[in-house]
Design a protein with these regions (language model features):
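Fibrous stalk/shaft segments of extracellular and virion attachment machinery
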Residues: 28-34
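C-terminal motif of bacterial Sec signal peptides marking the signal peptidase cleavage site
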Residues: 14-16
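A domain-level signal for the mature, folded cores of soluble proteins
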Residues: 35-192, 202-318
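Short beta-strand micro-motifs enriched in acidic
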Residues: 197-201
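Exposed boundary/loop context
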Residues: 10-11, 35
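Bacterial signal peptide processing site
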Residues: 18-20
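Sec-dependent signal peptide recognition
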Residues: 2-9
Length: 318
């Protein structure tokens, strides 16, 4: 039976006046009619959205005096960047002019590589594949500050749980135009996330708070809550996620993560969107089909813009 249909059928059965053996077929038919799965992930879209709204986190950011790199939303950012193609050892090429990237054209671009004497070859790459040669670049540093708080948006991805049999994983992805990290690993663009895992009935089971290349899973008692919304403390600069105020060790000797009270409180349930799946985006969120980088290419991978959520390993795991 399709995920979410049993819960819907149970609800309809409880509302029915007649015996189950007389109305079972009619109830099942009604449940099928109400069951919608536009992104073909095997979960009813309405049930996905119900869980997404219920567990959308409250994100507490560091004070402005400590961290100036604030969140944004995809459309705000696309209106302030151009798309370029990195030719190693040769001049980069512009693919989309400043302010012309959109959700509809981001993943439909193609560009030929360069060979001897930096001439274009017959080898063509496409922006809907995992190609880090494509990258988005702001014209100046002003974009790094992020959008006004009224425009911050969280991007939701739901899937069948990788941890709990019959359960669900609800991912909440946050976008920042800049990662002002420690040492010399600053880079443009930053996609961070947490994942709330539920049981088959949609009850909270645990939450994964991503931090750098890893993360930690927490039980309900280890988290702070605002009603049904888990509270997330975002590290200044790098935006890693932790459950409390404090100092946290990292894998880099001599550098720690710090979280604070006293900064903006981002209640993500006020502005979120379910993006669906890469092969079938929901709510016109076609940006998830773009496989290039979201920021400028630096000297190393660590100082270069990251790829989007659906091209990161955690998309199908945590």
């Amino acid at each position: 039976m399709r995920t979410g249909r049993m819960l819907l059928l149970s609800t309809l059965t409880l509302a029915s006046c007649g015996p189950l053996h007389e109305e079972e077929a009619a109830l099942a038919e009604r449940a099928d009619a109400l069951w919608v799965d536009a992104d073909a992930d095997g979960i009813d879209d309405g049930f996905e959205d119900q869980l997404a709204a219920k567990f959308a986190p409250e994100v507490r950011l560091a004070p402005l005096s400590i961290d100036w790199a604030r969140p944004a939303n995809v459309d705000w950012y696309l209106a302030r960047v151009h798309m370029r193609f990195d030719h190693s050892g040769c001049p980069d090429c512009q693919v989309l002019a400043l302010a012309t990237p959109t959700q509809s054209n981001l993943s439909t671009q193609s560009h030929a590589t360069k060979g001897t004497f930096c001439g274009h070859t017959s080898t063509v790459y496409y922006s809907n594949a995992s190609r880090k040669e494509f990258f988005l670049q702001p014209p100046d540093d002003a974009v790094h500050n992020g959008a006004p708080s009224s425009e911050w948006k969280v991007y939701v991805h739901s899937k069948k749980s990788a941890l709990v049999a019959g359960g669900y994983d609800i991912q909440y992805w946050f976008f920042y135009p800049y990662n002002d990290s420690y040492a010399s690993v600053n880079h443009e663009s930053d996609w961070e996330h947490i994942t709330v895992t539920t049981d088959s009935a949609g009850n909270f089971y645990s939450a994964w708070y991503a931090a750098h290349s890893g993360g930690t899973r927490y039980s309900a008692s280890q988290l702070r809550w605002n009603g049904t919304h888990p509270i997330v403390y975002s590290v200044d600069g790098s935006h890693a996620s932790y459950p409390t105020v404090g100092t946290y060790p990292t894998s880099v000797p001599g550098f720690s993560d710090h979280t604070y009270d006293g900064g903006p409180v981002w209640q993500t349930w006020n502005n979120w969107v379910n993006v669906g799946e890469r092969g079938a985006p929901r709510n016109v969120q076609n940006f998830i089909k773009y496989g290039g980088r979201w920021g400028e290419i630096g000297e190393t991978d660590a100082t270069s813009g990251v790829q989007g959520p659906s091209f990161q390993g955690s998309w199908n795991t945590y």
